Amino acid sequence: MVLVPKYLNFESDLAESVTNSMDSSLPDETTSDSIILTTFNDFSNWARLSSLWPLLYGTSCCFIEFASLIGSRFDFDRYGLVPRSSPRQADLIITAGTVTMKMAPSLVRLYEQMPEPKYVIAMGACTITGGMFSTDSYSTVRGVDKLIPVDIYLPGCPPKPEAIIDAIIKLRKGVAREVHERKDKLRQTRRYFTLNHQLEIVPIIHTGKYDEHLFSKFSEISIEPKLNVSPQRIEKSKSSISSQISF
């Protein structure tokens, strides 16, 4: 590669050229400039990052934000994304929404049917950690990375379409720097892939016993009538009411 900037020599006041010590990228000087020299790995990465085909997988409100990308306002076709309905034709799955225990085997089956190399974007708080269902829900998976490996985490409730585009751009940058042999080493070796979250452990508050002190206070209070009404007066009022109803 040759750089030809100009500078002035203060002694001779003449313009001279500066040539760096790097060799030319062309094999020889007769090679045309229209030839591009690259490696097969770089060419494969360029082709894959320019044509990511996502699998439509939405189970909650996050998918509404993802569906807005298809419209003309955001137009994610400019990034080469073509939505597919079959996992065998997709290389990207965006899990948008809550993943339940009943849906977990189906999600794993869809991921296994996708051809290699394949990528996963976890979209939304419900997909990443379970969201608002992570405290006391018996049927929610606390993170989709317990089922399949995740490449990009996209937090939000729900994330905006601009955030989804930013996640896709970051995934494209990761694909551009990827080495095929390195991706094979990271392939899932067991059915349920588990990752430990870096979250702070807090004491359990939903134990069902946090209202016992309130119930004990109410049980100690004795309710006594403040009006001293004789039983004869009560019977007299009942008879008068019944006589009025009969008329």
From Swiss-Prot:
> How many cofactor units bind, and how?
Binds 1 [4Fe-4S] cluster.
Q: What is the lineage of its organism?
A: Eukaryota, Viridiplantae, Streptophyta, Embryophyta, Anthocerotophyta
Q: Which reaction does it catalyse?
A: a plastoquinone + NADH + (n+1) H(+)(in) = a plastoquinol + NAD(+) + n H(+)(out); a plastoquinone + NADPH + (n+1) H(+)(in) = a plastoquinol + NADP(+) + n H(+)(out)
The terms describing its cellular component in GO are: chloroplast thylakoid membrane; respiratory chain complex I
Give the principal location in a single coarse category: plastid
Does this entry carry the keyword Protease?
no
Q: So which cofactors does this thing need?
A: [4Fe-4S] cluster
- Tell me the membrane topology, using the record's own terms: Peripheral membrane protein
Residues reported in the UniProt entry to bind [4Fe-4S] cluster: C61, C62, C126, C157
Instruction: State where the protein is found.
Output: Plastid, Chloroplast thylakoid membrane
Q: Which GO terms describe its molecular function?
A: 4 iron, 4 sulfur cluster binding; iron ion binding; NADH dehydrogenase (ubiquinone) activity; quinone binding
Please give the function described in this protein's UniProt entry. NDH shuttles electrons from NAD(P)H:plastoquinone, via FMN and iron-sulfur (Fe-S) centers, to quinones in the photosynthetic chain and possibly in a chloroplast respiratory chain. The immediate electron acceptor for the enzyme in this species is believed to be plastoquinone. Couples the redox reaction to proton translocation, and thus conserves the redox energy in a proton gradient.
Q: Which InterPro entries match?
A: NADH_UbQ_OxRdtase-like_20kDa, NADH_UQ_OxRdtase_20Kd_su
What are the record keywords, sorted? 4Fe-4S, Chloroplast, Iron, Iron-sulfur, Membrane, Metal-binding, NAD, NADP, Plastid, Plastoquinone, Quinone, Thylakoid, Translocase, Transport
Could you say which EC number(s) this protein's record lists?
7.1.1.-
Q: Subunit info?
A: NDH is composed of at least 16 different subunits, 5 of which are encoded in the nucleus.
The yes or no answer to whether the keyword Membrane is present is: yes
GO terms for biological process?
Answer: aerobic respiration; electron transport coupled proton transport; photosynthesis, light reaction
Name of this protein: NAD(P)H-quinone oxidoreductase subunit K, chloroplastic
- Stated family: Belongs to the complex I 20 kDa subunit family.
